[in-house]
């Protein structure tokens, strides 16, 4: 059995128009190109660490949007000019973006994965 009590009141900053790579240095950033709700946070912040702690079955509440259950967690790392996962899949940045943000999931939380001191070694999608 697992019980997680986590309450964070997060301020969400929109990305500047035309800058889909912008992530606010603190807090959460709303990803402008997501078909649903895409929220980004650096893994060095409390928000990013909270994203990384989520597991399938956990519930995330977004005020005015509702409750969402975590159904999948995907980990991707950068290999050459592609993104790779543990299952051996290899995708371009555009392919990964469509897969994650193309509309299958109404809410996506994203942070980076640190590995060996490289804080942007990979990407974590919840």
Predicted regions and their residues:
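Solvent-exposed, non-transmembrane regions of membrane-associated and secreted proteins
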Residues: 1-126
